[in-house]
Swiss-Prot record:
InterPro entries: Herpes_Orf11. Pfam families: Herpes_ORF11 (PF04797). The gene is 10. This is Uncharacterized gene 10 protein. It comes from the Viruses.
C-alpha cells in the first residue's frame, strides 16, 4: 500500500488569517502517484496547541465550531501535487490525507494543507419524501408474514413515534407496515434506531424509505448498516412533517454525526464489487434531491473522502439537484479490495455555493481571500469559520501552547 508516515518534525503548523495551515519542512518522499499520508497530529492537538481564546477553554466551546466539520483541503493551487479533500470523522485521531503527486519527492513547502471548519446545512432544514401509492399493485411485494408497527403521537405537536418489529427479506432489507391517518407526505427523521433481539446489538439503518400503499397504510423499508443475521429487528424512529423544506431527498440516509453537533451524509456502494489493485471504479448512488425555489443561493452536495486510513480513496465531486450522484473510488493498495454495501466510502456536505469564474478539476482553499474553490464552484464563505483575533500568522514547529 502506498502509505507514508511523516514524523512530527517534518511539519510546520501555523495560523494564517484565522485558518490552520500545515506544510512540510523537509523533503517528502511519496511512493506512488496517489499516496496515503499519515500525520502525527490530531485536529484537537493542533487547535489546542496553536491558539487560546480568552476565557474560552477551547475553540470547540463555540457553537459555530461544534456545528461544523473539520475539512482538510489543498492550501492554494499547486502544480506539484494535489490534496484530495477529506472530512475528519474523529478529531482525536492522527490526521490522514491523500496526495496525488506528479513527483516522487516534494521539496520543503511544496505540500500545504488547510484545516478549515465548515458548517453544512442542518438536517432540521431538510425533508425526505414519502412516496405516493403506486397506480397498480403489480410488481409490489406482498407477503403473508407482514409485521404491523405502531404510530404514537408525541408531546410535541405533529411529532410521531414509529415503533415495531421489522421482518427481514431475501434482498437484505427489513420492512413493516404502519396504519395512521396522519402520515405526512414530507417528513424529517430523528433518533432512528434498530437492534437485534438476540444478542441485543444496535445496528445503524443506512437507508430508509416510506411508501404509501393506500390513504392510511404505509410500508417502511430500511437497509441495516451492517450484516444482520436476525430474522426480525426492533425499530424506532421519530418523524415530523415539514411543509416547506429547503431540500427534499428521495429517501433517507442515516447521517453520520461528526465533531459535537454536525451531521454529514454517508455515501455507500449500491452493490458489492471487487476493485483490483491500483484500479478504480465508478458507481451511482441511488438517491436524488430537490432544492426549494425559495432558496436564493444554489445548494449542492460536495463529495469528499473519509479522513481515516483506507485502501479506497474517493475523488472529490459535486452532486447537483435533480441529478444522479456519481462516485469514483481508487484502490491504492497492492491487492484487490471488496466494496461492501454496509460501509460508507465517502461523505457529502450540503453547502451553499456559486459558480467559479475559472473552473478547475481540483479543490483548494486560499487563506488570503477566504475562498474555497471546489471544481466549478466557490463555496459560500459564510459557512467557513474563522476568528478575527487570530489574524497574525503563528508558526509552530514543535507543538506547545501559544496564546493568541
Amino acid at each position: 500500500m502506498a502509505t507514508v508516515t511523516a514524523p512530527m518534525n517534518m511539519w510546520s503548523v501555523r495560523i494564517v488569517n484565522g485558518i490552520f495551515v500545515l506544510s512540510n519542512k523537509k523533503p517528502l518522499n511519496l511512493p506512488a502517484h496517489l499516496s496515503q499520508l499519515n500525520i502525527p497530529y490530531s485536529v484537537h492537538f493542533i487547535v489546542d496547541s496553536l491558539a487560546s481564546f480568552g476565557l474560552l477553554s477551547s475553540l470547540f466551546s463555540l457553537d459555530q465550531v461544534k456545528q461544523s466539520c473539520a475539512l482538510l483541503v489543498q492550501h492554494k493551487p499547486n502544480d506539484q501535487c494535489t490534496v484530495l479533500p477529506t472530512c475528519v470523522l474523529d478529531l482525536e485521531f492522527d490526521i490522514t490525507v491523500y496526495v496525488r503527486s506528479r513527483q516522487r519527492v516534494l521539496q520543503p513547502g511544496a505540500l500545504q494543507l488547510a484545516l478549515i471548519f465548515i458548517k453544512p446545512v442542518n438536517g432540521s432544514e431538510m425533508a425526505w419524501d414519502v412516496r405516493d401509492p403506486p397506480e397498480t399493485m403489480v410488481g409490489q411485494r406482498l407477503y403473508e408474514n407482514v409485521s404491523q408497527g405502531t404510530v404514537k403521537a408525541l408531546e410535541t405537536p405533529d411529532h410521531l413515534l414509529l415503533t415495531g418489529e421489522a421482518i427481514g427479506r431475501s434482498d437484505g432489507t427489513y420492512d413493516m407496515l404502519f396504519k395512521d391517518q396522519k402520515i405526512p407526505c414530507m417528513v424529517n427523521y430523528s433518533n432512528v434506531f434498530a437492534s437485534y433481539h438476540s444478542p441485543n446489538e444496535e445496528i445503524l439503518p443506512r437507508a430508509l424509505e416510506i411508501t404509501m400503499l393506500g390513504q392510511k397504510t404505509a410500508r417502511l423499508t430500511f437497509r441495516p448498516g451492517h450484516e444482520c443475521p436476525s430474522a426480525t429487528v426492533s425499530f424506532r424512529a421519530e418523524v415530523r412533517p415539514i411543509l416547506q423544506p429547503k431540500v427534499l431527498f428521495s429517501h433517507f440516509l442515516n447521517w453520520i454525526r461528526v465533531n459535537y453537533d454536525c451531521q454529514v451524509m454517508p455515501l455507500y456502494p449500491e452493490q458489492e464489487e471487487v476493485v483490483n489493485a491500483h484500479d478504480w471504479v465508478r458507481f451511482q448512488v441511488n438517491n436524488k434531491f430537490l432544492v426549494s425555489t425559495a432558496v436564493d443561493t444554489p445548494l449542492k452536495v460536495f463529495i469528499c473522502g473519509l479522513g481515516q486510513p483506507s485502501f479506497l480513496v474517493a475523488d472529490p465531486g459535486i452532486w447537483n439537484p435533480s441529478s444522479t450522484c456519481l462516485l469514483t473510488l481508487h484502490n491504492i493498495s497492492n491487492q484487490p479490495v471488496k466494496l461492501r454495501t454496509c460501509e460508507p466510502v465517502a461523505v457529502g456536505l450540503l453547502l451553499y455555493c456559486n459558480d467559479a469564474h475559472l473552473p478547475s478539476r481540483d479543490v483548494c482553499f486560499c487563506s488570503e481571500t477566504g475562498r474555497l474553490e471546489w471544481r466549478n464552484c466557490v463555496v459560500d464563505s459564510s459557512q467557513i469559520f474563522s476568528w478575527p483575533h487570530a489574524t497574525q500568522a503563528k508558526s509552530l514547529d514543535s507543538p506547545k501552547s501559544m496564546d493568541s
